[in-house]
Amino acid sequence: MATSSAASVDMEDIQTVDLMSELLRRMKCASKPDKRLVFIGPPGSGKGTQSPVIKDEFCLCHLSTGDMLRAAVAAKTPLGVKAKEAMDKGELVSDDLVVGIMDEAMNRPKCQKGFILDGFPRTVTQAEKLDEMLNRRGAQIDKVLNFAIDDSVLEERITGRWIHPSSGRSYHTKFAPPKVPGVDDLTGEPLIQRKDDNADVLRSRLDAFHKQTQPVIDYYAKKENLVNIPAEKAPEEVTKVVKKVVST
């Protein structure tokens, strides 16, 4: 009885509008098919732009390894405690621990209809361990979306970015220039470039990405669930392609 009472009190503390919104969301999602997706792509390829759109459209949860690790550590779950011990020693969290934490995260109600994995797997070993875990759940990855884009296009996209530091407003010298070069439109304050938004840093990051990720792309290509997304297109065009791919 105590457990029931505690649960009742918790529910009573939730605003009616929040309860209704969640009930409506779950009713809308009930008829959606399950989808288990992996998004792969280099920095600047648009994965981060597309993930929330697809998450909401198909009632999926977005699983980021960094967010999951932080949540498990904060909640002091058994796996979170082990992960914290490794991090405190300056060690990398093992693939088995990461996949275990991911397995726990997939039990949440918001992951009922499936998930988008972003930033994982990064290696073939991780991909294999992910498959093993999903097999134990009687599931598998449905689609792997590779946001394919030429490095030269990425360089133009990223090195042209300028930021207004206090507001976060972003500009681009070619695609979305400020009214006055180097100056924020609203405040007249100077714009800055992030340290990582330069050609040398980008080339280094892209080189590391290609070396690390190409074997993963090949792994999924052999499983015939890999789809290349033309990520050089405008975001709204990419969204149309991604929705079509995920829907089929």
From Swiss-Prot:
PROSITE patterns: ADENYLATE_KINASE. Residues 160-197 are annotated as: LID. Residues 64-93 are annotated as: NMP. It catalyses: AMP + ATP = 2 ADP. Keywords: Acetylation, ATP-binding, Cytoplasm, Kinase, Nucleotide-binding, Transferase. It is an enzyme of class 2 (transferase). One of its GO terms (cellular component) is mitochondrion. Gene3D superfamilies: P-loop containing nucleotide triphosphate hydrolases. Pfam families: ADK, ADK_lid. GO terms for molecular function: adenylate kinase activity; ATP binding; copper ion binding. The keyword NAD does not apply. Its main location: cytoplasm. The modification N-acetylalanine is found at A2. AMP binds at T65, R70, E91, L92, V93, G119, F120, P121, R122, Q126, R194, R205. Its EC number is 2.7.4.3. It is found in: Cytoplasm. ATP binds at G44, S45, G46, K47, G48, T49, R161. Belongs to the adenylate kinase family. Monomer. NCBIfam families: adk (TIGR01351), PRK00279.1-2 (NF001380), PRK00279.1-3 (NF001381). Catalyzes the reversible transfer of the terminal phosphate group between ATP and AMP. Plays an important role in cellular energy homeostasis and in adenine nucleotide metabolism. This is Adenylate kinase 3. It comes from Arabidopsis thaliana (Mouse-ear cress).
